[in-house]
Amino acid sequence: DKKPKSFLATDSYRSGMLNALRTNFRQISNVLQEGIDANGGYLVPDEYDSRLIQVLNEENVMRSLGTAVTTSGEHKINIAATKPAAAWIEEGGALTFGDATFDQIILDAHKLHVAVKVTEELLYDNAFNLENYILEQFGKALANAEEDAFINGNGTGQPLGILAETGGAQVGVTTKSSGKVTADEIIDLVYSLKRPYRKNAVFLANDACVAELRKLKDSTGQYLWQPSLQAGEPDRVLGYKVYTSAYFPLPAPGKAAVAFGDFSYYNIGDRGSRSIAELKELFAGNGMVGFVAKERVDGKLVLPEAVKLLKMASA
């Protein structure tokens, strides 16, 4: 037997949502009443949510590198705080066991709201693909806000970013100069990361910093940078892929300039479905109609030792 569809996956709910968008939520069909969100607005149809997630993954480098989980409530992750140890014993000798201890990481739900504006002419033009436009705009706005928080967030009312002083990535190398990174320091950064994490490790930095990395040469005069040989594939440094983010801070004295590690240990918790609501009368005076998308999300680096930072020396 086929599993019955969730009401969010039905064609009638999706068409009801499109009609509501086109009428600025002045016409609400009965089927849409099922999707009223407790925080205001209407839960987006499954197809919309899938397309939003696709845009989020394309636009947000941290989502493409991290691990996303869908949660219905507070999500707890148990992390082994102590590792098992092996010991040689004499024949017939007594076995000794240490007590395993666990730390607990909790993914909560922080509310993120983004708004987009549409002209009334486009809203009522049936030839205009309103769905695609709104989902693309919402997706990009949500992705930008998420990426910023997943990198720089302080954990208060927002996710905890990889650069957080507490709970973020660990400092692997501090540069000798406050304004310059050397090839040797990048090599040291790679080997500051424990071997198991190096297998899936990548670099992450601001574009301006990556421009400097491209110029670095080793002791034999060879560039560390290795251009990609395949379209769509990232370039590499020392054999490791390089990703950029506009939200990774520019190199500055006393601040992190480059992150290197296995970012799959950055866990992203999506709480439930996203919702859409109208912004009543906010733009009424200039012929614009506003919509707001809401989501609840959290993010944390569950193993800080999985990502290492190259930190600039203080001035």
Labelled PLM ranges:
Residues 24, 296, 303-305:
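Residue-level recognition of alpha-helix termini/interfacial anchor residues
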Residues 61, 83-86, 147-151, 155, ...:
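Intrinsically disordered or highly flexible coil/loop and linker segments, enriched in small
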Residues 100-104, 140-143, 227-231, 267-269, ...:
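Glycine-rich loops and low-complexity Gly/Arg-rich segments
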Residues 1-105:
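Assembly-associated, polar helix/coil segments characteristic of icosahedral protein shells
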